[in-house]
C-alpha cells in the first residue's frame, strides 16, 4: 500500500468520528493537486491591520513574534513564512500550510486551529489536514522549488531556502497548534478521546 492509499484508508477509518473528514478525502483524491506545473506567486498576507479575532489573528501573532520556544523541549522555532501553497493547480484557491518554521536543520510545518465561541474543526480534522498537506509537499516540492513558491518579501532567505533540503531527507516536523479554549473544548470536555490521536 502506497502512502496515498494508506492515508485514504486512515481517513476513511476516522470519517465516522468527524463528517468533515470527507473534505480531506476529496483533497487527497484530487489528481490536479499533484504534479500541477503552474507558476504561482502568492500574495503577501496582511500582517499589520488584522481585522480577524480568530485563527488568522493567532497565525499573525505567532508569525510576527518571529520565534517560538516550545515549553516542553525548549526548542526554538523561527517563523520565516506563512500561507505557503503545497500544491500548484489552475484553481485560484490552493491548499496552504498555515506556518512555515525552521529549527536547526529541521523544517516545521504548522497547522493552526482556533476556538472562540463558534464551531471549529476537530483535532481529527486538523491533524489529518496537516498529514495530507505534508504528503502533497512530498509530491510537489520539486515544482514548488522550480517556481520559488514563497513570499519574496518575508524573512525567508530566497538564496538558501529549498524544499529539496528538507522533504526528501525526512527533515520535516509537523506541529498542530491551537489556543487554550480549543483544547479545553475538545480535550477537556472530552468531545474526543486524546488517546485516539496517538
Describe every region a protein language model picked out.
Residues 1-198:
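Charged, terminal alpha-helix-loop-beta segments
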